[in-house]
Amino acid sequence: YSREIMHDLESRYCTINTGNLVVDAFVSNLLLQAKSLGIALQTDLKFDKDILPINDYHMTIILGNLLDNALNACKNQLNAKIKVSLRSADDNFSIHVANTYVITSPDKAPEDFESTDFIHGYGLKNVKNSAETCGGFCVIQHENDIYSVTVIVPMSS
């Protein structure tokens, strides 16, 4: 009986424990949603929680928008995949979110593909503003049906 309860708890509550509550909450929530939608999710979370150059407010803006956009882009896709990476390396901290996405309108630039459910078009602008406020920058790419956003912030900011 206790095995059944533990299995039930584990299957309902996929938890990430990096030590940063904002990251843990957003990525754990993404895990649950991706699992329920049949979206493959890969995470790479290697950073020191004690020396992040992005405060909780800006981390919430950046992760909230990027993960929401990735999840929305993957809904109703076959073989959908999302990759989330947060890493401290050398002098920089990077957040990289990539997802499968087939562009149906070739005239649009990658910056135009934002979640329609999240304040219609302000998501990526807010991500860019937060990155710049923290002394960093944002790179948006779309190649080979993979849409990705990378935020890089110097560790000294």
Question: What spans do the regions from the language model cover?
Answer:
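Conserved ATP-binding N-box helix of the HATPase_c
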Residues: 56-80, 130
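Glycine-rich ATP-binding loops of the HATPase_c
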Residues: 134-145
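Conserved short strand/loop->alpha-helix "switch" segment adjacent to the catalytic nucleotide/phosphoryl-transfer site
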Residues: 15, 19, 40-62
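Short beta-to-alpha transition helix within the HATPase_c
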Residues: 3-7, 19-37
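Conserved glycine-/histidine-rich ATP-lid loop and adjacent helix of the Bergerat-fold HATPase_c
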Residues: 126-135
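Short beta-strand/loop element within the Bergerat-fold HATPase_c
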Residues: 81-91
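Glycine-rich nucleotide-binding loop
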Residues: 103, 143-150
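Glycine-rich/acidic phosphate-handling loop/turn and adjacent ATP-lid/helix
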Residues: 93-125
